[in-house]
């Protein structure tokens, strides 16, 4: 059946900002869908609020809107663009919920728009817990005993029926948001409160516990002719009770019998048919009782998902691309398999002859107050995937790819009590405790009893632990070719072997090279070698035949960023993708190395050759040994590849672009200070301390308050502002573990300074200023957590001119060749240099979208030898409109965590708003970030004494827009003295009713709360913010943010939507750019 010709224009809804439960896998799927539909001649309109995505590049879709993903904004776009259809299955839960809201509010009917890929009824049937349960009963599939509830009374009645422990699952949420497992009445009440709030339909499923059952997933694709295929089966290493996004998962399923697999396969197809998913991909989750084999259906997602991105990367089958084409009428047998060069149709089920393991990455170090126990609400921020011929090999490769300081199991001496507790109550490191248990002499039965992990997996880990313990007793000289090869086949890294045998990693590598023992590379081909693979999608293993077949072309290798984490996320992958595309266009063969299954960089057609490998020195050197690239780029993947720069250079690798020595000159405090002194540039007063005693002494010289941090970190890891010697001593005790024997840096903290970010490109002869961004939050808030505006909204032209001059001077002095980011602080018109990073920064995608200048692409060509002049890229573009980037935080996933901002980065993603004024752009950025900004109601003000003079104007603006004001007594008296009418409200410690009572009673619409450094003020402010977070009340904790929102509220419901291509055209005309 050919594609549909009755529709011409299709709108795709993206997933919005990166949040826990919905990450960059939707950029991967959305980008595939856009390309697939344009390939078929459809006009594609894309809506997404996330500027760090490849899918929002102006040359991806025909028309691109970087706008808030809410139905009111979508209606404005639909009215303007008049699409024939909407594809809502590529943007996760956000897109599905938005599509349903468009339908519910009559927008689809009003403009005659149809949903393709999944009908409204199919979405509702899959997402509505009650309807889904009824559908499963109808087709004879069991589900856990459960009840749909819309009130606390119903919830308690249901709980009595199912007993404890009780699972609570809200409807229409992602990543298990709002859900959890309750073991007692207090926990049940708390989780239900959270769940009702999280569910847009105020609906919960109260479900019997199936904790300890084995969990499986099936990735299914179906077309309109009822052809169905299973792309991949996935088994969760962790049993039921841990969200699948937080579980280690393995593909294909390892412990199913063939009979069980066929039953599950047939059930999956029956689920899709009953729900009504007739074009596209879905994910169906099952649980099996290990005691008797009983199988139940847990849930299904009628869209591409996190698991489908994993299945696509695991098999090479492009689920999103195929699903997009099925949505416009094709059938599976009409589409061809790209990996095999079109030799076979996509109706052939993929077959894999290797094992894929995904391990999640967590960020609890950023949220010390958070509960780190894993439940049905997802908490991981990223993941790593590895392939090997066995589970053992792929697991060990995945563990070293996590970049958490381990290169294998790294056994620890934990107490038996700790081990039992960690096995029974899973946390982020449970797999390491499994190994610790075997190392401590626990039996297989004991470990299974406490963890409920399938014995087959435990046997594999027990064997690896026994290998480690035996290796510790061996002499290095005893390791011959056969023994070393046997260990490598089980996934042991050179570094881990070296640690166990007490030699250096380079000793092991030298011995391996002397024995001519190298990995071979196998191709991911979807067909287990039955047909020739046309694409070079490769993984390493220790076997005989190598399928890499390297070419003799001039090659550039790009090292990716590894797993997402706070401080290093999709922005760096964006840069890697642009480097690959630009260099390929310039005639180079591009080689991508990465291990993150969520990303566009690990799509098999982004680069010429893809190596899905951990980003360790050993793994990278082996690929270089095989491929012999002309140059390697380490500047685009964040701190991960940068840490390898010196070692790669020492091994004779040609690092193109800025040299490792220049990177070190920017990071090394003494060297960098000398450069600034020579240039006559200012830095905040600072010193470097190597121990606690020295820090205390030097702090007196610098003067409090201080910004303290370890050297060589990304994302402000362990960065803090300290106000006195006691706080400094506390910091020194806690921060030593993250300092890597590097010194602690002490900088004088510049109060009330404006922070400024600059991205630029230097080619040794000229400097292109990419953009000057003014932060909304003052210096002292991590740049990744602050909102910022391009162009600057209050800096004078003189200050901006001087910033440009200083940026250029530093780029030349450091010998930068490629991208560079500088952070300045401006205090009373005086400019201070905070730090310089001669690499890609997390603001590069935002600057590129805001200006239309593709910085990552231009810089990649500079690194390969093409000057800025040759690219006609020497003119800074200053747009005639404002773009605001706003950070998005995961606080809702971590009840109890304080939401105040600090020098340590805690945001997971970002959004962008555009407007003719800063206020309009800021308002749209707040909407995009999910803030529910009220148009009326009462604003609560509690302001630190030093901030009170500036709050008067904020209060006046808010009052002029019709808001009521209430404040604590000190703030209220100050405002009244300055002519602002305000109601007085009690602080928490001043009696009842107080501000927290008012918050809980829904009497407060917005909160502006700045805090002094007194312990009682900090504690009270935390309670205010914690309660506000529960009820989604917008809260602003800095004066600058308060000023911005007081201006932004004028634009409530009065904003325009702007196509990115039109914005860039207006920018080019304003700047007379002809390129």
Curated annotation (Swiss-Prot):
One of its GO terms (biological process) is glutamine metabolic process. ATP 2 binds at residues 709, 748, 750, 755, 780-783, 823, 835. Its cofactor is Mg(2+); Mn(2+). Mn(2+) 3 binds at residues 823, 835. Large subunit of the glutamine-dependent carbamoyl phosphate synthetase (CPSase). CPSase catalyzes the formation of carbamoyl phosphate from the ammonia moiety of glutamine, carbonate, and phosphate donated by ATP, constituting the first step of 2 biosynthetic pathways, one leading to arginine and/or urea and the other to pyrimidine nucleotides. Residues 549-930 are annotated as: Carbamoyl phosphate synthetic domain. Pathway: Amino-acid biosynthesis; L-arginine biosynthesis; carbamoyl phosphate from bicarbonate: step 1/1; Pyrimidine metabolism; UMP biosynthesis via de novo pathway; (S)-dihydroorotate from bicarbonate: step 1/3. Mg(2+) 4 binds at residues 835, 837. Residues 133-328, 673-864 form the ATP-grasp domain. Mn(2+) 4 binds at residues 835, 837. Belongs to the CarB family. Residues 404-548 are annotated as: Oligomerization domain. GO terms for molecular function: ATP binding; carbamoyl-phosphate synthase (ammonia) activity; carbamoyl-phosphate synthase (glutamine-hydrolyzing) activity; metal ion binding. HAMAP family: CPSase_L_chain_A, CPSase_L_chain_B. This is Carbamoyl phosphate synthase large chain. Mg(2+) 3 binds at residues 823, 835. It is an enzyme of class 6 (ligase). The gene is carB.
